[in-house]
From Swiss-Prot:
Family affiliation: Belongs to the universal ribosomal protein uL10 family.
Stored PANTHER family: 39S RIBOSOMAL PROTEIN L10, MITOCHONDRIAL
Gene encoding the protein: rplJ
Protein name: Large ribosomal subunit protein uL10
Function: Forms part of the ribosomal stalk, playing a central role in the interaction of the ribosome with GTP-bound translation factors.
Annotated organism of origin: Leptospira borgpetersenii serovar Hardjo-bovis (strain JB197)
GO MF annotation terms: large ribosomal subunit rRNA binding
A biological process from GO: translation
Length: 177
């Protein structure tokens, strides 16, 4: 790769890192083109994207990008070989779940690491995040939790009114008899 191409590749990766500052690193060795295309389509549905990397260029882009500049991120020996970065904005748990589900079917996709909100994650950390509910599910849970006490109070008030109505009805029937 010529020097100018490397500079352009680093600039492209820096742009991706600043736009979508969370990512997962995965080894894709052994996947067919069709399998990679299928994974990319699933990731696109979640607003994410997958880029095949040159490891040294990605490390350089990490060190130069704004959000990751002060972080001590490096590739150990477990990160050697063909890697792809799967970029995500706010939905890394959902993207991690897509990768986990894909890896169950295609054993050649191996998640190596991840980065979420300033924290470097190992493969186990990414797998743990895949088990978290999505942002939408969390919001629904919060809304349900907020709504539950109001629903209980409304039900209690309705029961009091219904009991009062039954008591008035019983008194009216007793007086008429």
């Amino acid at each position: 790769m010529a020097n100018q191409e490397k500079v352009e590749a680093v600039a492209l990766l820096k742009g991706k890192l600043e736009e979508k500052n969370n990512f997962i690193l995965a080894c894709y060795s052994g996947l067919t083109v069709e399998e990679i295309t299928g994974l990319r389509a699933q990731l696109r549905k979640e607003g994410s994207e997958m880029k095949v990397l040159k490891n040294n260029l990605f490390l350089r882009a990490l060190k130069e990008s704004g959000a990751h500049k002060d972080k001590n991120i490096s590739f150990g020996p477990e990160y050697q070989g063909p890697l792809a970065a799967i970029f995500a904005k706010d939905n890394l748990p959902t993207v991690a779940k897509v990768c986990k589900d894909f890896a169950k079917v295609n054993k050649n996709l191996i998640v190596r690491a991840g980065y979420m909100d300033g924290s470097v994650l190992d493969a186990n950390g990414v797998e743990a995040i895949a088990g978290l509910p999505s942002r939408e599910q969390l919001l629904a849970m919060i809304a349900g939790g907020i709504n539950a006490p109001a629903r209980t109070i409304a039900s209690g008030i309705n029961q009091i009114v219904a009991s009062l109505a039954r008591a008035i009805q019983a008194t009216a029937e007793k007086n008429n008899a």
